Every structure is written in C-alpha cells, then in structure tokens.
Amino acid sequence: MKISTTGIKSVLLVVAVLLLLPTPSRGIPAFARKYGVRCYTCHTVPPALNKNGYMFKRLGYRMPPDEMDGSKPAPRITELDQKIKWDLINSFAILLQASVSGDKNIAETGATPPSTETSSSSFNLDEAALFVAGPVPETGFSYFGHYELYQDGSNFLEQGFGVWTGGRANSNYFAKGGEMHLQEGEGTRAAMFYNLFPDPSYTLTNVDPNGVTLDQHPVGVDGGYTWASNYFKKIFALSFKVTNGLAADGSEILNSSTKNSKDIWVDGDYWFGPDGGVTAMYYHGSKDQVQNAGTDSQFTYTPSFYRVGGFGNYLFFDKLDILGGYVYSHDDWAWDQTSPLSKYTANRYRGEVDYYIKPGFALMARLDRGAAQIAPNPTVHDRAWGAGMEYSMTKLGNIIVRGTYNQEHDADPVAVLGSTDKLFKVDFRFMW
C-alpha cells in the first residue's frame, strides 16, 4: 500500500505536539479527559453513542447535568460546565486506526466466463484524524472540527462548523452552520452511522445509480429543538438541515455552484427506557446527472429524489441491544432524452444484534437486505451480513481491537449484474 509522505508527516507532527503538551496521566479522548470520565459515559463502545452521548452532542458538547430532578428549574445552557476549566489540550483529540485484511471479490460479467474473481491481502493504515471541539466558556456557542490527516491516500476537511445553543438543559434549541455530516451521528442508535462494525450499515450508506447517498458531508445550515424529562429518562428531538447537496459527480458542493436548488433533511428522535429509541427521517433533493458519459448519447438532466426511513433499538438488561431499520428510496431516472422519465425505487431493511459481555467487550452480528428496480428492468436484490467481536484493551476505553467478517452482494439495477465481496479484517484503533 502506498502512503503519501504528506499524510505521514502530518500524523507525526500532530502526535509530537500533543505529546509535548502538559497532560494528565490518563491520556483519553478530549471530552473524557476534560470531565475525568471513561469513554463509556457517552459510548456503548466508541464510537457508538448512548443516550448520554446523544444529549451531550445536542447540548453543544456540554455534559448533561446530574441534578436535573425537576425540583428546580433546569440550568441554562450558559450555566453548564461552569466549574470545568477551559484547556487547549482538552479541545483536541487524535484517532489512529490500522488493520490487516483479506478480501475476495466475485463480479458477474454477463458474458463468458460468467464471473471474474480477485483477491488481496494487506496491512493498512485506515485512518489518522484530528478533532477539535468544545463549548466557548460562558456563552451558548460551541465548535467542531474534523480533519482527516490520512484516509485513502489523501487529507481533507471532513467537518467544520459552529453552533449556537440556547434555552435550558431540559428544553433547548440550536442553530448550526458549516460543513457537516448529513446523516452520520444523527438519530437514535439504529439510525446513526456510529456503530460497532468498521463500516456503517449498508442500508444507510448504499449509493444509488444517480450517485445519491446519505453518506455525505455537505455545506449547509442545521437547526433543532430538544426536550428532556427529569434525569433525561425520555428525550424528544427534532432537527432540520438545508444543504447545497451533491454535484454531478456525486461529491459534496462545498462552495459556489450553478445548482441553485437546496436539499432538505428532517429527523425526529425519541429516546426512552434505559437506552432505547426510535427515529423517523426524510431527505429530499436534486442533483445534476450526466447520463451515458463518454458516449455519443451523453446528456445531462436534473433528477429529483427522496429518502424516507424509520429506525428503532432497545437495550435489554444493559446487555443485549437489538436494532432495526428501513429506508425507502425514490429517484427520477432517464434512459434517454426523448422517452418519459422512469423511476428508481428501492426498499432496504437492516437488523442488528449487539451483546455487551462487559463494558468495552461486545459481540455483534447484522443483516441488511434490499430490492431495487428501474423500470422496465427487472428487480435486483442486494444483501450484506457481518459478525464480529470488539474489545477495549484499556479500562478507559480508548484503545480498541476488533475482528470482523463481512459479506456484501451489490446489485446494479441498470446493468442487472452484481458482485459479491468477502472481507475479513482485524483492526486496531487508538484514540487520545
């Protein structure tokens, strides 16, 4: 594997700076260092969020208060964390992930031979990322930045935004602007991209023939409202985003563009019980699409699309987490410039079972299935399943080893062909 010199230098520079800064003896990710807690305060196993971690995020990266019993008014947002001293080192965190993997791919050809097979094995530097986040003391403002020092041979800004949060801990509202994830980190646990596997659920991340996916980080604005009962036993939240959306090549529009229409995303969440929740999600937009690229029949049009999703999970006995979800996809589709528009439709389901043997030690299994069609082509079916184990090597939860096996069958509704990928992976994640 070829690793860019720039990426390695960036990683070494950040590590050196962080090591030279004065730190407490227990080096754990920034928020845990700041509050003197373990990673499990906000995570089941990092990066999967629990109810407390969800509320921490909704409060603008402020810790939910323990004393919210209803006997007196809940503290205002500006009153939270008043006893926590701001420290530069507690605003920064670094993540490093490396792995060893074996991969086998079988692709249908529609010809002779009917399929081709390739295999590979490698040691990998999966990711090196730098985070900066936290509230501005004595104000309602907070900030978040996520820079990929190295990922897939390049470095780039993944997220960067500012937030203003007002109200009280039990009834608050926020406004956010900048480059942010569309779906990742949003919703209750079954809807979040954050999970125990190396990659999010296929139901959430699949890319349709128009290049549309929920796995994007566009520039836009975000607003929302959150209500919580005493001790945060129940949480109700609404969020609304307006973003630039996607360019013709499927990349995020980060600056000026001739695409003047905006995409909208709406999410409603309800948390209940020890750590259960349900989420309803709607995403609507449009994008420029280059059809039949590189041929004499190439043309450009602007299809509209929408996604509707429902998700839920419940944690039994603080041990067994059962998750499920459904996403319906609907896109315009043009075979040529003269025929009436056709439609791309897809129905996908996901199910997952996570069993926590003890804090930081979990077994997991999941299944995704779906069907998609572009008339008049026949319906094609895709599926993905995986199983694995995740174990924290420290009591603090910041060094994790994980082993997983995933098998995924992708079906192309345009070519009516598919491919199957089988991946075994052991990865090591260090968070500081």
Task: Label each region the model flagged.
Residues 119-128, 154-158, 215-219, 260-264, ...:
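Residues that define the transmembrane beta-barrel architecture of outer-membrane proteins
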Residues 38, 389-393, 398, 419-432:
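Outer-membrane beta-barrel "beta-signal"
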Residues 50-51, 87-245, 260-262, 268-280, ...:
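Outer membrane beta-barrel
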Residues 233-235, 259-374:
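Detector for outer-membrane/organellar transmembrane beta-barrel domains
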Residues 129-131, 161-163, 222-224, 267-269, ...:
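Outer-membrane beta-barrel architecture
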Residues 36-47:
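The canonical Cys-X-X-Cys-His
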Residues 348-408:
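Outer membrane beta-barrel transmembrane domains
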Residues 100-110, 151-155, 183-187, 229-231, ...:
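Gram-negative outer-membrane beta-barrel proteins
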